[in-house]
């Protein structure tokens, strides 16, 4: 449950991000020529350009594991005896004593970089072993007999620290020792240099340019725009996500074992070919085009299991260009193809009643770049992928996700002084090419999981709002009221980028169902604001006093003062209930009860208050006064305990149900002190953050305005 006192924290990391950007924007108004004496409406043009390059570096080291690694690397080249050169023992009379000794056999090809570097260091320093003998090339070196300061990361090479994919170090933009790597190392710098294995920084380039025109045609107001976005991940990616090594295509496979091969008519020349044996193929079992699989007859199949089950060893067998290849080369990679998106924006409105009633429509397309965690594919992830069956890796080919917004609305201004308003709108948003987990089943040499632009979502909303200003005597009062309501439904195939993890773990890797989208599926949201605000000073034209509040003892007590109350309530978001509890900290998945996101959190309620009071002080020698604004801001005045999250088995924020479950009772009975374990477990439950909303908070401050 808890880390023991004195636990060693041995992980160390650092990171660095550089961002270089260029932004330019210009505006101009174009007045068309007068036609037949009629002046045509002007065009307000806006154009812009944006360039950005990020350079991200990171380095992490698991120092504790280095002690284990040193023990594995030291002395392994002298682990055998030199039996071809025995040393016979004789007594003083030259009689053989029946004792044969051997020196250690030095196998130089097995000597690790660490052993060579550390041994040379000890030899140069004249150090001795545990028996007091000077250390030489045949000495057994006990690393535990030396002090920590005798060692250093620089004694290892990159291959040893990366440890065939189970690394003690991770890095990009730095070398294996944590030194900054400038520029962009080539793939060959990693593949062909095991001592350094250089990995470049993540250096994506983003370019955008846009043009917008706003003009009026009769009583219609238009705002038309077009934005071009170019995203270049600036990295190498897998040439074929289903194989680290090049696969022959149907167009390349004409014969096999001296016999002609006739491919089905629906099989294209660029389809990948799969056979019955990796090393000695005798027949074609199927084909693949992208993610679509076909059997030998050309019939489309749902998955590639049928091919793997019919091979000689039960594993997928692509018809490799080089059947003996077991390490990735440049042929298995390609450069990222920059993605260009054209994003139109259309907005127009027309008055149903000039100055009072307006109808508007908008259409907008937006793009969002993938985050670096899902899209930055380091070369070491691919190089060691063959050793990591079922691993999750980044996808260097991720594209931007696209969101398309549609909105139609109606606005009306009314009241004697036009200080009342109403707005109603309906919206629909569609998210395409969203990011989600995807399993590459029967990839070669391993099945693995990555990210794809595969998820889809829709958000449907209705909004209504009204406001009333200057409520009071002659529509010049201090009170302003605002009320807004939103109804929103959000459904999609993934609530977040990792929402498919449970299905992948349950052997349903690429099943997509439409479910509510977590925080976006708000359903109901009501927000109201009431503000009392009094002005001060005199009207610069009429010279009348602008203060309309109460006067007490001849003082304008509420001059430059305001009181605001903001109330907000919304229905709780969805969560997924489960059929059994899971112990805190346990890596275990519980069975879903009902359907995903089939239950909802309670409603949320908050009431905030903001009080401000302004003062104006004259300053000697200054024309403008010193303005002082004092404020008190109180959030969640009623200290409402809003539930933000619950445990999926109980639906409660303070009890996960484990202690009272049969499994929990067994765990309690196995403890040395059952009561102590129970108490500590409850303390841990009560220590979880994020289960409740923020309590009442009071902030006070002063702002000074020096004009």
Question: Which role does the model predict for each range below?
Answer:
Residues 419-577:
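Gram-negative outer-membrane beta-barrel transporters
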Residues 367, 537-588, 602-606, 612-707:
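C-terminal beta-signal and adjacent terminal beta-strands/loops
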Residues 51-55, 217-219, 228-232, 354, ...:
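Transmembrane beta-strands of outer-membrane beta-barrel pores
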Residues 29-44, 60, 82-85, 352-356, ...:
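Short loop/turn motifs that connect adjacent beta-strands in outer-membrane beta-barrel proteins
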Residues 2-58, 96-141, 191-219, 331-352, ...:
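Outer-membrane beta-barrel transmembrane strands
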Residues 41-49, 220-226, 357-361, 420-426, ...:
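Transmembrane beta-strands of outer-membrane beta-barrel proteins
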Residues 351, 358-370, 374, 383-449:
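Membrane-embedded beta-barrel scaffold of Gram-negative outer-membrane proteins
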Residues 9, 47-353:
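Signature of Gram-negative outer-membrane beta-barrel scaffolds
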């Amino acid at each position: 449950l808890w880390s023991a006192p004195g636990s060693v924290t041995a992980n160390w990391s650092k990171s660095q991000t550089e961002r270089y950007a260029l932004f330019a924007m210009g505006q101009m108004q174009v007045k068309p020529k007068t036609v037949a004496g009629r002046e045509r409406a002007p065009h307000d043009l806006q154009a812009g350009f944006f360039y950005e390059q990020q350079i991200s570096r990171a380095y992490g080291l698991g120092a504790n594991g280095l002690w284990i690694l040193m023990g594995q690397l030291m002395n392994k080249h002298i682990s055998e005896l030199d039996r071809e050169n025995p040393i016979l023992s004789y007594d003083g009379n030259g009689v053989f004593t029946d004792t044969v000794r051997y020196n250690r056999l030095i196998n130089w090809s097995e000597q690790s970089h660490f052993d060579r570097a550390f041994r040379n260091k000890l030899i140069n320093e004249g150090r001795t072993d545990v028996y007091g003998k000077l250390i030489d090339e045949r000495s057994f070196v006990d690393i535990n007999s030396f002090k920590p300061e005798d060692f250093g990361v620089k004694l290892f090479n990159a291959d040893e620290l990366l440890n065939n994919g189970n690394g003690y170090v991770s890095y990009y933009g730095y070398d294996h020792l944590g030194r900054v790597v400038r520029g962009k190392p080539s793939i060959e710098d990693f593949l062909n240099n095991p001592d350094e294995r250089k990995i470049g920084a993540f250096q994506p380039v983003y370019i955008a340019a846009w043009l917008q025109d706003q003009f009026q045609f009769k009583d219609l107001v238009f705002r038309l725009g077009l934005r071009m976005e170019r995203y270049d991940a600036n990295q190498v990616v897998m040439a074929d996500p289903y194989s680290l090594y090049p696969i022959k295509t149907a167009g390349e496979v004409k014969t096999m074992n001296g016999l002609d091969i006739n491919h089905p008519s629906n099989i294209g020349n660029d389809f990948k070919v799969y056979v019955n044996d990796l090393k000695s193929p005798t027949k074609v079992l199927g084909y693949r085009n992208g993610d679509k699989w076909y059997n030998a007859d050309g019939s489309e199949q749902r998955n590639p299991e049928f091919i793997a089950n019919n091979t000689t060893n039960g594993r997928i067998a692509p018809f490799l260009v080089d059947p003996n290849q077991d390490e990735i080369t440049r042929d298995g990679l390609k450069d990222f193809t920059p993605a260009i998106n054209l994003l139109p924006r259309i907005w127009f409105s027309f008055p149903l009643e000039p100055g009072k009633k307006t109808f508007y429509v908008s259409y907008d397309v937006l793009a969002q770049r993938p985050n670096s965690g899902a899209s930055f594919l380091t070369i070491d992830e691919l190089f060691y992928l063959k050793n990591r069956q079922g691993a999750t890796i980044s996808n260097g080919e991720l594209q931007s996700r696209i969101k398309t917004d549609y909105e139609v609305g109606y606005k009306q201004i009314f009241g004697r002084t036009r200080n009342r308003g109403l707005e109603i709108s309906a919206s629909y948003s569609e998210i395409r090419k969203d990011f989600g987990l995807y399993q590459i089943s029967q990839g070669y040499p391993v099945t693995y999981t990555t990210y794809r632009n595969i998820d889809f979502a829709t958000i449907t909303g209705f909004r209504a709002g009204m406001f009333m200003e200057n409520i009071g005597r002659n529509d010049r009062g201090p009170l302003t009221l605002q009320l807004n309501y939103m109804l929103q439904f959000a459904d999609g195939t993934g609530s977040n980028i990792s929402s498919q993890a449970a299905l992948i773990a349950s052997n349903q890797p690429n099943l997509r169902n439409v479910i509510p989208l977590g925080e976006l599926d708000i359903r109901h949201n009501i927000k109201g604001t009431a503000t009392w605000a009094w002005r001060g000073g005199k009207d610069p034209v009429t010279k009348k006093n602008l203060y309309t509040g109460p006067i007490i003892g001849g003082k304008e007590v509420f001059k430059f003062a305001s009181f605001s109350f903001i109330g907000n309530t919304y229905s709780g978001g969805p969560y997924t209930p489960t059929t059994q509890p899971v112990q805190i900290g346990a890596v275990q998945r519980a069975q879903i009860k009902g359907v995903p996101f089939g239950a909802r959190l309670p409603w949320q309620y908050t009431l905030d208050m903001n009080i401000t009071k302004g003062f104006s002080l004259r300053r000697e020698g200054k024309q403008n006064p010193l303005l002082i604004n004092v404020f008190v801001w109180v959030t969640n005045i009623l200290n409402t305990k809003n539930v933000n999250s619950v445990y999926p088995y109980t639906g409660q924020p303070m009890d996960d149900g484990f202690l009272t479950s049969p499994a929990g009772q067994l765990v309690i009975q196995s403890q040395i002190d059952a009561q102590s374990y129970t108490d500590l477990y409850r303390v841990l439950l009560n220590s979880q953050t994020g289960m409740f909303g923020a309590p009442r908070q009071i902030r006070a401050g002063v702002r000074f305005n020096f004009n």
